[in-house]
Amino acid sequence: MTINEVIHSPKHPLFNTELNDGIVTTSNEYSYYRNIPDVKGLTFDVSNQKTLANLDVCGTIQTLTFYRENLLTEEKPGVWVNKQLSQTNSLSLKVEVNGIVYHLSESDHRIEVDVIQDCLPRYIHHYSTFKVIVVSFAPILANKRLSMLVQQVYIVNETHESLQVSVKDVPLYQEKYSDQQNVLISQKGNKDTIAQQEVASFAIAFVDPNAFEEVMTFQESDIEKWLKETLNYFAQLFGQLSMPDDRVVHLYRRALYQSFSSFGMNRQGQVVGSNWGSYPATNRIWNKDMYYASLPFTMFEPELCQKTVLWFDQYGVKFPGSKFTGGINHSLSNSLSSALLASLYFEHTGDTKFFERYPQVLLNASRIIEDILAQRRSGEPMLFPSVWLSDAFALGKYHTGSNLCLWKACSGLAEIFEVLEQLSLSKRYKNIACKLKESICKQMTTDGTFGEQFLEGIGDEEKTTYSVKNYQKPILEQGLIFLSDVIVDGKINLLMHDGEESDTTLMPFYQFLDNKDPLYQNTMTFSASSFNPTYSEEIKGITWGLESGATFPGFITVLMSDLHNHQAFATRLEELICLADLDGSWWWWPYRLEAKQGEVVRDFGCGKCGWASGLFVSTMISQYFGLKFKKGVLQIDPVDNLTFSWKNLKFGQAFISIECTQSELSILNLSEKPLKISDTKKILHVEKGKTIHIQRRKR
């Protein structure tokens, strides 16, 4: 995208808003949030992981965050690590035109805001004789992230006379110099004279004081080139996807951007955790949120994935505490996060050098798995207990999703050890994975309304229920607030789907079951039906006990329930489009209790939802577009009736362009190396620059 396009490109068709005379409008005809007159809580967010900026509809930087180090805490079941934050609030710009100062953050003029290329916010401030365009970005240069936010400012003369223009210095303090400002401010360009229709450009950098040397880098660099490079980074991350319904493309990209923006890095480039989403920045790190938000990295951002694996290798297991005992069984799935991400990373990239460089990853993953396996008692099934999922229980004596994670960890490590020629370990974990899968499919299922399906977990005395007494213990009992819909006569009904249990939804992504397997399909269909006690037909989502009318990951499970019904799936996607706020983000809790469809809220208890965004990207890629790697072979099997074009797609170890029609797949290998692609009957070796054509199967 050229700078001219940045200035003059049309307004984003979906994600935009306008403030004029105190009235908020949008050209988005679909979002439920268009009906909310108050813009409180609506933010447009900018991130490169080292820097996070949350801007309001007027363009004020509400909060600018730089990330620091980690520390252990003892507070919530799903939180035992915090990250330190350095923050500054309420930063705004002023311009001077012909001697008059204009405050851009004041609502005394018409303000338009949208997102460029589904990533960076663009503000257009309209005045009688000129307009000011501000594009905010956190620089990503040749994959190097700078610890700063940059605002590129363009002042456009819309009169027949020349204008004297300048951008005023941003105040370094409010009332006295000792006021806390955790930021360095540097400006390029000061004054200019512009003739009719000419443009003056300025740049302001808000720099982390701990990276003070980057101020000089800013002063010596071409900032418009930085903007182009940053936009190009996201263009490469997204690829050029086109579909009959452009709204789905925009929704997908914003979900990927939300996952990306959930994460924090310190100045040294180490991942130090995540937030709920891109807003707000939180000291607390919910490990489970971080895990799901990171799943797209396994496919699209290998360097970030490596750093996330290393973080979970250090912090995945809850340490021994006084409030919570800790240990592997505190949360089985969280304890396995490093092993899971390592498995998915290898599955998509085929890279073994990372594991040779960091041998502790496989050593620690194996140790955790061996400690879990050692718990098994004679006569017990090949299943293992877990207390917590995140802040809610891993329900039952044995929880289905948690044991599924153990299966994926074992299966994935077996593949890695095989390539590393550690064949005895590979064989051991393959055998364990086989036994786990057999136990999960035979013992954690029941004959449901739609056929055989998975339970949330299994009980001890009765398979489909679990006594609430198991949780009526000090501290533990606080988790019962999330279970109000499933407790009957002192028993928890395990024939249900928890809106924050996402691993069963990910079964095809994990390659545990095919998405056409009746066992998987029946489970998803049940989850999105009135037979699931947590499902709400009114809002087409899954409720969250006494806390919230809906939890957003549940909407992704509901989406997958109609994967193979073209029209029904389109209707589910339509609902996700409607639930996206005017910036394109999803909120963790979009509904209050007892709300009607469309009665959405912002910033209700939780922030934006990186968990659901990562889940959406992963399920759409693996199940809808049908892209996956199996033993280094690329498989592409889109759902029936789907047509799309995806040029310059970097997916794991592949760099390809795909054309998908109703009858044929055309795949061009753009990578430097030959690529192995399956056409269901045989494996094709596709050389660089070559295109293959695969006939789509009729089902």
Which residue ranges define each predicted feature?
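Acidic/His metal-coordination segments adjacent to aromatic residues that form catalytic metal sites
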Residues: 272-274, 279, 315-329, 382-399, ...
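The feature captures the catalytic groove of carbohydrate-active enzymes
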Residues: 193-219, 326-333, 369-431, 463-474, ...
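Substrate-binding groove/exosite segments of carbohydrate-active enzymes
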Residues: 232-347, 499-510, 544-551, 556-568
